[in-house]
């Protein structure tokens, strides 16, 4: 008797899991991390059997992902591959979308102080084409010093002044590298000095005409052009008085005011102008700035001397006789506006000429000096019927010391003389005793 034992042939699914006993060399490739591109970056595995034959997705295996968003940077994405049909087992793979590098650059700029804010532009490089964002530079430097050229970037996931949702570029999808510029405001250079009127200004009343001895009042304003508080010091020309010259702890952009006074000299009148310079310095720096104000409202130089001659000691209209003495006073008056020097007064009639002339070392404006002279009436005067006496003079011109040409008005005095009466009396006598 033959006894049959019928065996059972069992065909099992080949496992894709290398750790499974039914694994027969099936390979599943591995993904690599990818950089954000703005596009969907779903990774699809390649599965091959031991003979190198590619298995078919959704027939021989299925693929699932633990994250539905495979466009943006979200972290690790786990991919699960499950065998299907004649294949079994499970294997997982992971990858991630990495942030795209972005460079934000703000520009550097240098400029001399001009009282306005220094700004500069910037740019963003690396944002995926088509995505939008908000960008502006916010750096600003007004006063002498330096600062970073800062910026403001508005992303899709930012909330800045109600702009959330306006833009599409997400900050999490990018890694930002900054290149920040510097804004520098200088106080000028030796080659290109700063306009001093940006720092110091000086003014005076231009509505009047000044003469020697008048006091001119100047108003001085000085500004702190530096980005930190400074002590401001004013220095005036010799002869100019300041009511205050040191101002401490002056804030950036703040101004201080001082008053200066100056007494006009005759030399200023001769020059025709007076230029007043005030120097401004700031604590902690070597910079110096000079404010200039020129006064040209000065009266014209007018050197002049008038000589007068008067008769003294006799009544008006007195008629002089032969041999009588006429007494004169000769007066030299400076009726100009400049002091005269080396004054010489001459009276030819009395012989006060040349070495005998009257001299005055200095004669100030409105000053007068008088000399007494006398003259004896001669027969020629009687014949002429009058005595005419002229006095004149010279002085060094202050406007041109090398040329003694000061205008002089000479003095003249005419006095009447008795009418000539020539006569001869003959007396005849006789001797009656003879």
Predicted regions and their residues:
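Exported/extracytosolic protein signature
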Residues: 192-434
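Solvent-exposed beta-strand/loop surfaces, strongest in extracytoplasmic domains of secreted
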Residues: 1-194, 210-211, 218, 262-264, ...
